[in-house]
Amino acid sequence: MNDISTIFKEKKLKLTPQRIAVYKYLKSTHEHPSAETIYKAIQSDYPTMSLATVYKALKTLAEVHLIQELNVGEGNFRYDANSSSHPHIQCLSCGKVDDIMGITFDNLNKDVSSHTDYDVISNKLYFYGICKDCKDKA
């Protein structure tokens, strides 16, 4: 939890129990939960916390780069505590989102820069397919 304390102190932001709870939950899972899923998971420990508070905490955590906000389409967002640059794959059947680790963007960033008049600052790469569980059910 040192990283969140340090970052919030540097940014002069208030570190609330709600923000800590949301961050801890995200750090404890390899899933990419929605705000609603996070809310339901921590509601028993924080019964007075609203869904709006969870959304605000997620927005702040994303703004300080402690988490990633993943736009999985149609206004549907998921959240990832692994803030390093990495691609994701989403199941088109069940909506599950997984990390794809071990792929670097170095060459892709250079190629994009050399083919455009842009300096690449960041990127997000998504793949779509059918997960093993859904294939096994078919």
From Swiss-Prot:
GO terms for biological process: negative regulation of DNA-templated transcription; regulation of oxygen metabolic process; regulation of secondary metabolite biosynthetic process; response to toxic substance. Represses the expression of most of the genes involved in oxidative stress response, such as rbr3A-rbr3B, dfx, rd, nror, fprA1 and fprA2, coding for reverse rubrerythrins, desulfoferrodoxin, rubredoxin, NADH-rubredoxin oxidoreductase (NROR), and oxygen-reducing flavoproteins, respectively. Thus, by controlling primarily oxygen and reactive oxygen species (ROS) scavenging, PerR plays an important role in the oxidative stress defense system in C.acetobutylicum, an obligate anaerobic bacterium. Probably acts as a peroxide sensor. This is Transcriptional regulator PerR. The keyword Chloroplast does not apply. The gene is perR. Pfam families: FUR. The lineage of its organism: Bacteria, Bacillati, Bacillota, Clostridia, Eubacteriales. Signal peptide: none annotated. Belongs to the Fur family. Zn(2+) binds at C91, C94, C131, C134. Coiled coil: none annotated. Residues 1-73 are annotated as: DNA-binding. InterPro entries: FUR (IPR002481), Fur_C (IPR043135), WH-like_DNA-bd_sf (IPR036388), WH_DNA-bd_sf (IPR036390). The keyword Cell inner membrane does not apply. SUPFAM superfamilies: Winged helix' DNA-binding domain. It comes from Clostridium acetobutylicum (strain ATCC 824 / DSM 792 / JCM 1419 / IAM 19013 / LMG 5710 / NBRC 13948 / NRRL B-527 / VKM B-1787 / 2291 / W). Disruption phenotype: Cells lacking this gene exhibit almost complete aerotolerance and increased H(2)O(2) resistance. Deletion of perR does not affect the intracellular level of iron but increases two-fold that of zinc. CDD domains: Fur_like. Keywords: Detoxification, DNA-binding, Metal-binding, Repressor, Transcription, Transcription regulation, Zinc.
